[in-house]
Amino acid sequence: MQQAVEQALDCAEYIVESAQQRPPKRKYLSSGRKSIFQKLYDLYVEECEKEPEVKKLRRNVNLLEKLVMQETLSCLVVNLYPGNEGYSLMLRGKNGSDSETIRLPYEEGELLEYLDAEELPPILVDLLEKSQVNIFHCGCVIAEIRDYRQSSNMKSPGYQSRHILLRPTMQTLVCDVHSITSDNHKWTQEDKLLLESQLILATAEPLCLDPSVAVACTANRLLYNRQKMNTRPMKRCWKRYSRSSLNRQQDLSHGPPPPQLRLLDFLQKRKERKAGQHYDLKISKAGNCVDMWKRSPCNLAVPSEVDVEKYAKVEESIKSDDSQPTMWPAHDVKDDYVFECEGGNQYQKTKLTILQSLGDPLYYGKIQPWKADEENDSQMSPSHSSADDHSNWFVIGSKTDAERVVNQYQELVQNEAKCPVKMSHSSSGSAALSPGEEAEQAETSSIQSSVLGKGVKHRPPPIKLPSGSGNSSSGNYFTAQQASSFLKSPTPPPSCKPSLSRKSSVDLSQVSMLSPAALSPASSSQRHES
């Protein structure tokens, strides 16, 4: 099947090419009158036999213009005026002068659509029949299109002319049948059908009934060559630049913008206003300008007196809490709190270590992911740990502050995981002593510090969630590193010597190494509010 179609296409190409180069001559009856189609064909054969004046050019074109010039056929004149003048129709009278009958704006383009399709408009049938000169040629009408839109001289404008053949359609044939049968005679339905068939035979083009695929391919090829630039997408593009479309755009530009485009209109006007502004900026040559900044006076005299109270800032001392005296431990005490939670598809297990070293009254904390193989490493005190581990420990303060840190971290993990949290506690350091020795040791180790007892109270910094942690869409919990970054001190814990006496006063350098957040009363008030 595909091979037969390919052969038919090749045959159609050969027929079209041979008809353009050497069209065959037709024989007509001597008594018969030639129709306009036969005249056009004879003119086509005649032009093909002539040699072109310029090579690569053909003479068998513009046949309708040549036929009108040879036989002076009557035509329907259509004038296309520039701008908003519209278009008009003219008919020729008996005296040979043309008279304008209809003038319409470009917005009413129904007649132009019929002219573009080379079809006879049904609304002009009655007007053309009443014309003083016979304008019909075998049911067709020759229209001359005079285009004045490309003329530059408005006083005596010239025009570009071309001719088209308006063919009758079924709608015009129905109008003809109705006008013929509207007299006083009685027409039966059979008479009307017979009249319609005769009109179709008289106006229709020759029909080829050869049952060959090549005939259909040839007809399609000829139709394509004639209508290749008359497709719907091309018409849509042309309508954007038609006179009616340009007039509509011009009217909209002068009128007020719709409510939906007020912002666009404002931006467009502001852009035009800025484009119209011109700034006369001139850069003078070097040496011609005066530096006013260098010429301004500069007073650099040293003041004799300085108001210290105006620039100084007094920091209030931290009030002491005598209800809980500072305890000097007799040994290292380490408490491990393991928090386990499982939310969704994730499992989290972190460990909070609270440590009080020997000879140090302060508690330190460390948060890390829990691992079984790190049990030995976690037993090291911050004073004996390496320099790399100092950044992981943060200062907590007293025992009450350590309990508060545990509660806050448990609430933090539970809020982030949005599920119940299991906490397990294990302590080391004091378990090696007997109950009696532990009581005696605690009694002898409870000593007030000469410095810390005078109003120094260490409070842990408040635990705050990061701004984006609560809105995280990934579902990750608050990690140990994030919590430790909010709890740890910017300074590492002090390294206490084992030989330091418990009765001696605390060195002032140790107090200065505490974080400002841990010592400030503002952080303590924020923690109580949280």
From Swiss-Prot:
Bias (Polar residues): 442-451, 477-486, 502-513
Stretches the record annotates as Disordered: 419-530
Chain positions with Phosphothreonine modification: T491
Tissue expression as described in the entry: Ubiquitously expressed throughout development.
Coiled-coil region list: none
Residues carrying Phosphoserine: S296, S515, S520
Record's GO cellular component terms: SAGA complex
Deletion phenotype: Mice show gastrulation defects in which mesoderm migration is defective due to deficiency in E-cadherin protein down-regulation in the primitive streak. A weaker mutation named droopy eye (drey), which affects splicing causes incompletely penetrant defects in neural tube closure, eye development and gastrulation.
Domain of life: Eukaryota
Amino-acid biosynthesis listed as a keyword: no
Keywords: Developmental protein, Gastrulation, Phosphoprotein
Stored InterPro entries: Spt20, Spt20-like_SEP
Short name of any one Pfam family annotated for the protein: Spt20_SEP
Gene Ontology molecular function terms on file: transcription coregulator activity
Gene Ontology process terms (BP): gastrulation; positive regulation of DNA-templated transcription; positive regulation of gluconeogenesis; positive regulation of transcription by RNA polymerase II; regulation of DNA repair; regulation of RNA splicing
Compositionally biased intervals (Low complexity): 424-436, 467-476, 514-530
Subunit structure: Interacts with ATG9A. Interacts with MAPK14.
Its job: Required for MAP kinase p38 (MAPK11, MAPK12, MAPK13 and/or MAPK14) activation during gastrulation. Required for down-regulation of E-cadherin during gastrulation by regulating E-cadherin protein level downstream from NCK-interacting kinase (NIK) and independently of the regulation of transcription by FGF signaling and Snail. Required for starvation-induced ATG9A trafficking during autophagy.
PANTHER family hit by this protein: TRANSCRIPTION FACTOR SPT20 HOMOLOG
Family to which the UniProt record says this protein belongs: Belongs to the SPT20 family.
Protein name: Transcription factor SPT20 homolog
